[in-house]
A protein has these predicted regions:
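ALDH superfamily catalytic-core signature
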Residues: 8, 133-136, 140-151, 166, ...
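N-terminal Rossmann-like NAD(P)+-binding subdomain of aldehyde/semialdehyde dehydrogenases
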Residues: 1-116
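Single conserved hydrophobic/aromatic residue that forms the stacking wall/gate
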Residues: 314-333
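A structured beta-alpha segment of the ubiquitous adenosine-cofactor-binding alpha/beta core
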Residues: 112, 116-119, 186-204
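Substrate-binding/gating loop at the entrance of the active-site cleft, primarily
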Residues: 108-152, 157-167
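A glycine-rich helix N-cap at a beta->alpha junction
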Residues: 176-186
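General beta-strand structural signal in soluble alpha/beta enzymes
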Residues: 104, 154-155, 186-189, 208-211, ...
Length: 333
């Protein structure tokens, strides 16, 4: 493990950046709801104004990644089309439409006369987020951080450095123009700094890593900062017997084909035994017409699925109280 990942001490440049984010996070944590919404709208505006520069940066990243022979799935995540960028910009604005997550009373009860117990939501402080080569994640993470009154230190995959830099510059411009401290969002672009983040317990309040099991486990074992670990996704969808059939079909299809390369694209479909005959009768031709291959267990094969799931992929057993009759895995043809 030590040969793959090492935890260096942070250099002066990283310490300075981290301190700037920490100070900015204190200010933004005290910012009124309307001012945070205003900041998000400005951030979206500047992403639009810098669309050309962002797409050009992404084109350069993509060319370099192709030359390195990066797998197609990663290339798909790296590619930022104008449509995907516009969707991300729209997402930033929609985050502003969410209810204010700050200062919400979750629990309030009188323990005894004059003694009130109250639990309220407050900003965490500074988030350290390590993620894969998916530039649209920069917009999503940054907008959620600002909306919730937090600062954020970002480290994306090196394959997307040019794109991430262009996006963060636009977001920082928006923050500045809205009257907030642009240092609330910081991007790291080298591997050494991403590992040195683990020694920034005086500056970072929570680390959120997205990557391999090995990376997530290493981070959890080599930092004193709280870690919200994420590695393997569940990627399951369950169709209940009381589900709206048409809605279930639409959700099942969209969750697979809308962005198949995404880490949260559906891989496994579980169908309640009572609705399975009707659901699969409509689902099978729908999936086939969209180039989705279904493989399933013995009982789903009886209902029309043609390809049997390998026992090396799934373990089929008869539960004490069976809820499902279908264990079907989605995979593209």
């Amino acid at each position: 493990m030590a040969n793959i990942f090492e935890v260096p001490q942070p250099g002066n440049d990283l310490l300075e950046k981290a301190d700037q984010v920490r100070l900015a996070s204190i200010k933004i944590s005290q910012t009124e709801n309307q001012n945070r919404i205003k900041a998000l709208n400005f951030m979206a505006d500047y992403l639009e104004k810098n669309t050309k520069e962002i797409l050009e940066a992404n084109s350069e990243d993509y060319k370099r990644a192709e030359k390195k022979g990066i797998p197609k799935a990663l290339l798909s995540r790296l590619k930022l089309s104008k449509e995907k960028l516009n969707s991300g910009i729209d997402g930033v604005r929609k985050v502003g439409d969410l209810a204010d997550p700050v200062d919400q009373v979750q629990i309030k009860r009188e323990l005894s006369k004059g003694l009130i117990l109250e639990r309220k939501t407050v900003p965490i402080g500074v988030l350290g987020v390590i993620f894969e080569s998916r530039p649209d994640a920069v917009m999503q993470i940054s907008s959620l951080a600002i909306r919730s009154g937090n600062g954020v230190i970002l480290k994306g995959g090196s394959e997307a450095n040019y794109t991430n830099t262009a996006i963060v510059e636009a977001l920082q411009q928006g923050l500045h123009e809205s009257g907030l401290d642009k240092n609330a969002i910081c991007l790291l672009t080298n591997r050494k700094d991403s590992m040195a983040m683990l020694n920034l317990e005086k500056y970072i309040n929570l680390i959120i890593p997205r990557g391999s099991n090995e990376l997530v486990k290493f981070i959890q074992e080599n930092t004193r900062i709280p870690v919200l670990g994420h590695a393997d996704g569940i990627c399951h969808l369950f169709i209940d017997n009381e589900a709206d059939l048409e809605m279930a079909l639409a959700v099942a299809l969209d969750s697979k084909i809308q962005y198949p390369a995404a880490c949260n694209a559906i891989e496994t479909l579980l169908v309640h035994r009572d609705i399975a005959p009707v659901f699969l009768k409509k689902a099978i031709p729908l999936f086939n017409s969209n180039d989705v291959k279904l493989i399933g267990d013995e009982r789903s094969l009886e209902l029309g699925i043609k390809h049997e799931a390998s026992l090396s992929l799934i373990h089929i057993s008869e539960p004490t109280r069976p809820l499902y009759i279908s264990y079907a895995v989605f995979c593209l043809k």
